Regions:
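A short alpha->loop->secondary-structure connector
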Residues: 62-71, 187-200, 307
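A short acidic (Asp/Glu
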Residues: 51-57, 180-185, 245-246, 313-319, ...
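SIR2/sirtuin-family catalytic core signature
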Residues: 1-42, 222, 278-280, 284-286, ...
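Gly/serine-rich nucleotide phosphate-binding loop at the start of the catalytic core
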Residues: 1-184
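Short secondary-structure boundary/capping segments
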Residues: 55-63, 185-193, 250, 319-321, ...
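Acidic, metal/cofactor-coordinating or nucleic-acid-engaging core segments within structured domains
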Residues: 244, 248-298
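Cofactor-binding loop segments of dinucleotide-utilizing enzymes, especially the Rossmann-like FAD-
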Residues: 46, 174, 237, 308, ...
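Extended, H/D-rich, highly charged conserved domains that either
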Residues: 83-116, 122, 162-267
């Protein structure tokens, strides 16, 4: 099948006289050039965690099927779900947004304890949330899931270590799962995700201004950045984040749990919609989106977009703003998002698009990107030695 690589509206492969034998090499060389830029960012969408976790379409289908067969959901609410689904094009986040709005409306005009409508609406919301939670809260020891986890590990093995004179890599993700954390922990790669503390970890966006450094000289205060480190921004929340105001030290009211669990009495932060009691406009979402915007406006930046379909207008607006105000910002979309998306209609030489017309394992799949397109940074020349040592000592 055909591999495509466009710069703006221009076919990059044609202008560089590519043939079937060197197409991938030409794309890889260009991507390698971007890694020499001062600031390298990645944006992950649901495609990076497939098939271990369903994408948004898959989540909707699972919710729809279970609502149809659930006897505890009233027919009126089943019909309400179907009506909202049609109006919101089966987008599960937007469906939840409407239901959150209805719940707040009912809560505002009547006493919740006396309202059957409020109880039923709340029941439907919790039912949907629990399905989503269960689909995301997977076991990382199951074969299908370990395959995806290994891809994440390979990704971080390739990109985590950078020259100390360059900025650390930033990973922004709309995913709520724990694949990033699992991979980083398995590889002993340091990461900052906005939480600080020991046994109890609380959200503090100031952490994104910190870095890990090591002392270079025991006699004087001389430090240099730790190379194997990344910043992780979960801009749509995480399965292991909950609201918690029990501690006086938790100024932002968000706690990171070691093991994810679902509790109807606590709000798990994996459903950010504009109508969810304005939470997506407040902390932690406002802080995370602000960081996203700030990073894209830094000079000499590149954003690699993987597995994201440009379906979140808030995220899209920040990308558009970076293109409009930062002349040194480059955007590399490695996904077949379709020509109907507004971003694909822009003729700008700072926008690159890579995809393949293949129904099996096209070049824009996460596995193929990691194995065939991403450069293997020189700093990782010791990774095989270390991996072999760890393997042998365990045996």
């Amino acid at each position: 099948m055909a591999i495509h690589f466009f710069q703006g509206k221009e076919d990059y492969l044609t202008t560089h006289h590519a043939n079937d034998d060197n197409k991938i090499e030409i794309i890889k060389n260009k991507i390698s050039e971007f890694f020499n830029m001062k600031n390298v960012h990645f944006l992950f969408g649901s495609g990076t965690s497939c098939p271990a976790i369903p994408n948004m379409k898959g989540l909707f289908e699972k919710v729809e099927e279970k609502i149809k067969t659930e006897s505890n959901i009233q027919e009126d609410n089943k019909n309400l779900f179907n009506t909202i689904s049609k109006k919101k094009n089966n987008n599960i986040e937007e469906i939840l947004g409407v239901l959150y709005s209805k719940r707040e409306f009912l809560k505002g005009i009547i006493e919740p304890e006396d309202s059957e409508k409020y109880k039923e609406c709340n029941k439907l919301i919790h039912f949907i949330e629990k399905i989503i939670f269960d689909e995301i809260n997977i076991s990382f020891t199951e074969n299908a899931n370990t395959v995806v986890l290994d891809i994440y590990k390979s990704f971080y093995q390739k990109i985590a270590l950078r020259n100390k004179d360059l900025s650390r890599i930033n990973i922004f993700t709309t995913n709520n799962d724990l694949f990033n954390e699992q991979a980083l922990d398995a590889l002993n790669i340091h990461y900052i995700n906005g939480f600080n503390g020991g046994l109890n970890k609380y959200f503090n966006p100031a952490m994104f201004n910190y870095t890990y450094s090591k002392r270079m000289d025991t006699t004087i205060d001389r430090f240099e950045p730790v190379e194997n480190m990344v910043y992780l921004y979960k801009i749509h929340g995480s399965i292991n984040w909950i609201e918690d105001t029990s501690s006086n030290n938790n100024y932002f009211g968000i706690k990171e749990e070691y093991k994810p669990f679902y509790d109807e009495t606590k709000s798990t932060l994996i459903y950010p919609t504009p109508m969810k009691q304005n939470k997506s406009l407040g902390s932690p979402y406002s802080d995370l989106f602000r960081e996203f915007q700030h990073k894209l406006l830094e000079p000499n930046s590149v954003l690699f977009v993987i597995g994201y379909s440009f379906s979140d207008e808030h995220v899209n607006d920040i990308i558009y703003r970076a293109l409009a105000t930062n002349s040194t910002f480059n955007l590399v979309i490695i996904n077949n998002i379709g020509e109907d998306k507004p971003i694909c209609k822009i003729n700008d030489n700072r926008i690159f698009k890579v995809w393949e017309d293949d129904n099996n394992e096209p070049i824009h799949y996460f596995k193929q990107i990691v194995n065939k397109l991403l450069p293997n940074l020189d700093a990782f020349k010791q990774k095989d030695i270390l991996a072999e040592f760890i393997k042998q000592i365990k045996e």
